[in-house]
Amino acid sequence: MITITLTIPGAPRTKKNSGRIVHAGGLRLLPSKAWEQWANQVSPMLRAWALRNRLQPIASPVNCAALFYRDADRGDAVGFYQGLADVLEKAGIVENDKWIVSWDGSRLRKDASRPRVELALTATKE
């Protein structure tokens, strides 16, 4: 079974906490500014890592076991899962976040001195 492991430095952010509603031809809900800043910071790093390692975007079912080391005890697991999945798609690690079919082994933890996400993407037969 193939597993890809990596660490994303910096405080992970959820996508929907403090979401913004805009009126642009109708109502739209935008992701939180904190998530956008985090995504814009880590996506280029992840893209460069994928290029260095000649990784093609994942286009088959995987389990994402992610340890979210947060700077504070806030946010819910589902919000962190969604935020990470969208970052992995934006960076080209996964072709589409639909390929993340499970989050077995994921946990929310706190490490204010060194926030990060440690993750392992493992191929699955689901």
Feature locations, PLM:
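Acidic, proline/glycine-enriched N-terminal capping motif
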Residues: M1-E126
